[in-house]
Each structure stands twice: as structure tokens, then as C-alpha cells.
Curated annotation (Swiss-Prot):
Pfam families: COX2, COX_ARM. Heterooctamer of two A chains, two B chains, two C chains and two D chains. It comes from the Bacteria. It is a multi-pass membrane protein. The keyword GTP-binding does not apply. The gene is cyoA. It comes from Buchnera aphidicola subsp. Schizaphis graminum (strain Sg). A lipid is attached at residue 25 (N-palmitoyl cysteine). This is Cytochrome bo(3) ubiquinol oxidase subunit 2. Residues 1-24 form the signal peptide.
Length: 290
């Protein structure tokens, strides 16, 4: 006969719950700083709360049945011929179907609301940033300011940011967890991502798709500033850089594989460099048009 020590069982369960509740890790996804990230966090919380309608009753019934029908309980009713219950059938089918339908509606609705190509409404003019995934760092081009940077971007809060993204090497993934969605960077193609920060700070940007030996350190910093003057000063700093990026030959040199690359600024960036990079990795018989 198997005996269960329920005191130890509940103590263990309590310790597990405490471990999950009081862990010291900072969950970036649940500490959003952008309007897209806030909505994505809402989806996770809604899905979690809905799934509790399944999880909590199952946990409760598991504990209840194990106690009620334990071998030592002589008062439990023994029904060897029981095989059907309309009430149970209704419950076990109605609740899961309702949950699936609700989650399907939420998914469909938010898939359209959070379309990465969908523009974010703002009273300020959006900032365009062209993003190129290199081995193993990120090149950012500000076409309107004729500057480029490696592993650092800056933008004001409450300003829509339009990212045009490609890769000069293998497929990669562009992701700023605090601000919102990740999107793939693919050679010979362009993807679009719209984000907006609603609070100042420095946010970690990463590659979330394995791309070789330098992948783990393929990080960048996204700086969101409250004062537009800080952004303008940062732009001027880059425009005064002695390093230029006005030729494809220069780009081909800086795009060579390199790990743990430092932050770098370039002035005098070649016009339409981003699209030339795409065409360089595209079919020779086709030209990418923008």
C-alpha cells in the first residue's frame, strides 16, 4: 500500500510556488517600455489568466481526489459500474472549447493590431533607421541624417521608429525586448518593423536567431531620450566622425566577420547604401526596388 505524507506534499508545493514568485530575475517581457511591448505583455497576461481556468481546477481535483479516494478512507463510495456523467461531459467539453474560441479571437485581433508593418500614430515625424545584420554586429543607417553607427541607436521617446531590416550574411533576428516585436533579417530581402518607446532609458538589443560563433555577443544598445536636444547632439557627434561610409568598398571591409565589435560612428554615408547592400546579396539578374 502506498501512503502519502500530505504535510510534506503541501510544504514542497509551497516552496515551489515561493521559488517562482520570489525569484530575483528581471523579466524584460513583463517590464515593457514601448507601446508595442505593452500590448504584447497584455496578450501574455490574458492567455495566462485564461489558462488558469483549466490549470487551477485540475490541480484542485488532483489534490481532492487523491485525498478523498485514498486507500485509508473507508467512507468513500465505491462505484465499480459507474461509466458516464452528462454533467462532466458538458463541463470538460464546454470550457476548453470556450477557451480556444476566446484565445483564437484574441490572437486574430492582436495579429492585426500588432502587424509589424503597421504605422504607429504619433504627432511627431517618424524616424527611419535602416538595419543591416553583419557577422556579428549590427549596422544602423540614418538615411535622413546621412550617418551610420555600429551597435548603438538613439531616438526620442514618443516618436515612431520605422526600421527597415536586412542581412548581409545569414538569416538573423532583430529584437529589442523592452520595446516590442522581433523580426527576421534576411539577405536579399527587406522586412519592416515599427516601434515606439514611451519612457527614456537604455535598452538591450539582441539577435534572437543563431547565426554562428559570434552570435551570443551580437548585442547593441537602444537609447531612448526624453530631450530632443540629446538626440540632436548625438546626431551631430556622428556627423563629425572622421570615419566615412560613402563607398561600397568601405562597407565590404567593415562587414567582414568580427566579434565583440565596439560602438562606431560614420559620417557621409552613401545614398541608398541600404538598398545596394540588399542588391549585393540578391540575384544578379534582379534588382531590388524601393
Amino acid at each position: 500500500m502506498i501512503s502519502i505524507n500530505f504535510n510534506n506534499f503541501f510544504k514542497t508545493l509551497l516552496l515551489i510556488l515561493i521559488a517562482f514568485t520570489l525569484h530575483g530575475c528581471d523579466s524584460i517581457l513583463f517590464n515593457p517600455h514601448g507601446i508595442i511591448a505593452i500590448q504584447e505583455c497584455s496578450i501574455l497576461l490574458i492567455s495566462f489568466l485564461i489558462m488558469l481556468f483549466v490549470i487551477i481546477p485540475v490541480i484542485f481535483m488532483t489534490i481532492y481526489f487523491s485525498v478523498k479516494y485514498r486507500a485509508s478512507n473507508i467512507n468513500a463510495k465505491y462505484k465499480p459500474d459507474w461509466c458516464d456523467s452528462k454533467k462532466i461531459e458538458i463541463i470538460v467539453w464546454t470550457i476548453p472549447i470556450s477557451i480556444i474560441l476566446f484565445l483564437a479571437f484574441v490572437t486574430w485581433n492582436y495579429s492585426h493590431i500588432l502587424d509589424p508593418k503597421k504605422s504607429i500614430i504619433s504627432k511627431y515625424k517618424p524616424i527611419k533607421i535602416d538595419v543591416v545584420s553583419l557577422d556579428w554586429r549590427w549596422l544602423f543607417i540614418y538615411p535622413e541624417y546621412h550617418i551610420a553607427t555600429i551597435n548603438e541607436i538613439m531616438f526620442p521617446i514618443n516618436r515612431s521608429i520605422i526600421f527597415h531590416i536586412t542581412s548581409n550574411s545569414v538569416m538573423n533576428s532583430f529584437f529589442i525586448p523592452s520595446l516590442g516585436s522581433q523580426i527576421y533579417a534576411m539577405p536579399g530581402m527587406m522586412t519592416t518593423l515599427n516601434l515606439m518607446s514611451n519612457s527614456p532609458g537604455k535598452y538591450k538589443g539582441i539577435s534572437s536567431n543563431y547565426s554562428g560563433k559570434g552570435f551570443s555577443n551580437m548585442k547593441f544598445t537602444a537609447i531612448s531620450v526624453l530631450n530632443i536636444k540629446d538626440f540632436e547632439n548625438w546626431i551631430k557627434k556622428a556627423q563629425q566622425s572622421p570615419k566615412k561610409l560613402n563607398k561600397m568598398s568601405i562597407f565590404n571591409i567593415i562587414s567582414l566577420p568580427n566579434e565583440n565589435h565596439f560602438i562606431e560612428y560614420f559620417s557621409d554615408v552613401k545614398k541608398n547604401l541600404f538598398y545596394e547592400i540588399i542588391n549585393q546579396t540578391y540575384s544578379k539578374n534582379k534588382v531590388f526596388k524601393h
